[in-house]
Design a protein with these regions (language model features):
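N-terminal hydrophobic signal-anchor/signal peptide
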Residues: 1-63, 184, 218-220, 242-244
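Short, glycine-rich, amphipathic interfacial segments at transmembrane boundaries or analogous
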Residues: 22, 26-29, 86-135, 194-213
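Cytosol-/stroma-facing membrane-proximal "stalk/adaptor" domains immediately downstream
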Residues: 2, 177, 181-191, 195-230, ...
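A short, structured surface patch at a secondary-structure boundary
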Residues: 124-190, 231-234, 238
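Acidic active-site catalytic centers that drive phospho-/nucleotidyl reactions
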Residues: 54, 150-157, 215, 227
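Residue-level signal for cytosolic alpha-helical hairpin/rod architecture
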Residues: 56, 137-140, 213
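An acidic site on a long C-lobe helix of protein kinase domains
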Residues: 48-51, 136, 148-151, 224-227
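A hydrophobic, helix-centered structural microdomain
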Residues: 41-111, 230-244
């Protein structure tokens, strides 16, 4: 079944060439625009310097934010007694490599088993599940999710090399299993904490295909300048609540 986006941002993507004319087929029929081997060779120096930056800043952040992370662990433990404050989930990294992503628990312990009952209320098209008022989110979970505190354990993923500070968000295996060849291009880079989609105005109004187009756009455009622009825009979005 062909899906055509109707989001307000569609006109922008048409103008920038990241979407075909209305009525054209999207997804599997979008062209593969990135050669993975050439892309890697051309960015070798970039990868090395970026990895050094990731190690330095993740270590610095872990030290500076350790009191906040400890308080969060205590708050989550009090809110959900018996459940681990930090949980890990299998995600897909660069070139399809699987890794364990760490997060502070923002949902009830049996959240995965309740997912099937909520699929009918999914507010996102494509293979991704998103629900604004997800009943599985706990009281503390609402706060740490809104402020992105729940993502802080991923600094460990960055230090390990599973993730980077900037890059497309790591997807679940069940989501990647439904990717088209075009969407698979977002896996050519190391996943990160933030990317173009996270800083897009009204990001939750974007369709799945627009989200994927933003990630592929980053893979093509990435540079030190682009990365730092995304970092500063992410801080602004977290502090002032932009992007919802």
């Amino acid at each position: 079944m062909t899906t055509v986006t109707t989001a307000p941002e569609a006109e922008y993507w048409l103008q920038t060439g990241w979407m075909e004319e209305p009525g054209a087929e999207l997804g599997i029929h979008k062209p593969i625009t990135i050669d993975r081997k050439t892309n890697l060779h051309e960015h070798r120096a970039y990868w090395c310097v970026r990895r050094a930056q990731d190690i330095f800043f993740s270590l610095l952040a872990l030290i500076a934010l350790s009191p906040l992370m400890l308080l969060t662990c205590i708050a989550v433990w009090i809110d959900s007694p018996g459940a681990s404050p930090v949980f890990s989930q299998l995600r897909v990294g660069r070139n399809g490599k699987l890794f364990r992503l760490y997060k502070f628990r923002s949902m009830c312990p049996n959240a995965e088993s309740k997912l099937n009952d909520l699929l009918q209320d999914n507010e996102m098209d494509g293979p991704v599940f998103k629900m604004k008022d997800d009943p599985r989110i706990t009281r503390v979970g609402h706060f740490i999710h809104k402020t992105s505190i729940d993502e802080l354990p991923q600094l460990v993923n960055i230090l390990k090399g599973d993730m980077s500070i900037v890059g497309p968000r790591p997807a679940l295996p069940r989501e990647v299993a439904q990717y088209t060849p075009y969407e698979w291009q977002r896996l050519y880079v190391t996943p990160g904490l933030s990317c173009y989609w996270q800083i897009a105005p009204h990001r939750n109004q974007l369709s799945f295909e627009e989200w994927m187009a933003l990630d592929v756009k980053y893979v093509k455009e990435r540079s030190f300048l682009v990365d730092w622009k995304i970092i500063f825009a992410t801080f602004r979005a977290v502090l002032f609540g932009h992007g919802e």
